[in-house]
């Protein structure tokens, strides 16, 4: 376990810096949109999805369709990042 205050309880990698603890508590799926932990060449592929996730939670009412939108956005983000892995 690391002494880094940004590390998760599991110590696997740092907690998302892109969202506040309050945002993560309200919408746990947001933890999957962070990108600061990725290697620099992969961050540009992930960053726009993080920004769009932030826009979605800021502008859409919390309901089942918003959850579906975030889940599908996460699928797209994962594919975009994997497309850039050599």
Write out the residue ranges for each language-model feature.
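Intrinsically disordered, low-complexity regulatory regions
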Residues: 2-65, 85-86
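Short, compact, well-ordered microdomains
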Residues: 64-86
């Amino acid at each position: 376990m690391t002494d880094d205050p940004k590390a998760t309880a599991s110590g696997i990698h740092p907690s998302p810096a892109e969202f506040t603890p309050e945002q993560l508590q309200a919408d746990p799926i947001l933890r999957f949109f962070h990108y600061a932990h990725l290697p620099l060449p992969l961050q540009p592929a992930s960053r726009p999805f993080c920004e769009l996730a932030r826009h979605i939670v800021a502008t859409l009412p919390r309901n089942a369709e918003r959850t579906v939108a975030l889940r599908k956005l996460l699928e797209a983000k994962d594919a975009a990042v994997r497309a850039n892995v050599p």
